[in-house]
Amino acid sequence: MFWVMIMKKIVSAALALCLILSACGEAAPAETQEPSEEVGSVVKVACVCAQPSVFGPTSLNGYEYQITHYDYGEQERYIADLTAGDAPDLVLFRARPFGEYPGLDVNNEYYDDLYEYIDADDTLSRESFLPNLLEAMSRGGELKFLCRQVEIATFVARESAVGDGYGLLPSDYERILAENERYLSLFDTFVTKSSLLDSVCIISESAFTDRENASCDFDNDYFRSLLEFCNSSPYDEYVDGQSTYDFDNTLLKREYLSSALRFNVMPGVYGDDPVFVGFPDGDMGCSYYICGLGYAIPAQSSNKEGAWAYIKHMLSVEAQRYVTAGLPVILEAFELALEDGDVSEEMQYKALELLERTKYAESVHDAGLKEIITDSCQNYFDGTATLDDTVDIIQSRASVYMSEQYG
């Protein structure tokens, strides 16, 4: 059995390497047929805020489409060309702010609604994707981009401590911590109030704001429980170095799931059946997707069929099955990746259940809304303001902000 597992992993790694080389434009085109005498229609692909290694194939559909990639680097020059009417056929971009790249916001009139492409397609449908993903990425009922891979941000606890993980609130975790001698801390020292609040800001943008109606609703028990959860961390600042507590002595562990293989090793790592509890909402718990490379079709694209063919190629089960820098966004490919990773049936079930608990998505931040939430919480965290007063302040400031920005 050991050698069978090793050989399966070698084969998977080899296939993954082939796909990576193809994605970099260094291998043979997506189709292995000889090029036709006529050059296919050109698809101009702009790569913005993304490294060259993410470049995709150089031709598609037996050379029906010839792909030309342009590396824009920073987004300012690209936006200037776009607004001047010089749009590419497709844009590849980093959907999540990362390092020096701020991320590109495509939720505007310059880009097509990709639901129209999905709904008209004969092989790809909304149900092809991971549960809740498209809804989480949508704004005002429109889907302006798709992503190639995702991570899932969540919290994990042991079943012996939390049962099935349903219906938990911050007060429940405090009670479990007090009743169980094994656990010395709710979090390890790397999980600070501010790092938790960053995640709450991501959740809040989807859960408590309505851009279409320029409104928000932070005055609810769900948002209060999230702020309580942040304040339950005893750590105000991140301390570089090793955690004060052993892995076995912390009740909740933060996980950023970016590989199906992680589901294989988790039972051994936790020494008990792991439970994906997410962020507390008094129900199933909530987790969120972190979007990686994004694809968007400009409204002024001159080759929209070719642009959609490019996206479909990158989202095919064959290409998705061996995504190495995250989790596949196509459900069938995700399930196959679990099988390829020798994940147990029980953990496969838990992984699929986690998808149902993953309700939101991080893409491009609303920096103004985040600033309102983080600034308003400082007095609550240092003990000079009550939770109710803090929520009132956030609701008041955010209401004005939403009206001004989206009204």
Region roles according to the model:
Residues 2, 10-13, 18, 24-100, ...:
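Conserved N-terminal structural module of periplasmic/extracytoplasmic solute-binding proteins
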Residues 40-43, 63, 86-89, 142, ...:
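Loop/turn elements at helix/coil->beta-strand transitions in domains of secreted/extracellular proteins
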Residues 75-87, 91, 95, 99-105, ...:
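Short helices/loops that flank or line small-molecule/ion binding pockets
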Residues 98-154, 275-278:
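Hinge/lid segment of periplasmic solute-binding proteins
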Residues 118-119, 135-240, 299-305, 386-389:
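Helix-loop-helix "hinge/cap" segment bordering the ligand-binding cleft or interdomain interface
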Residues 228-303, 309:
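Extracytoplasmic/periplasmic substrate-binding proteins
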Residues 298-321, 388:
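Extended ligand-binding regions for polar small-molecule ligands
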Residues 324-379:
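Long, aromatic- and glycine/proline-rich binding clefts that accommodate carbohydrate-like moieties
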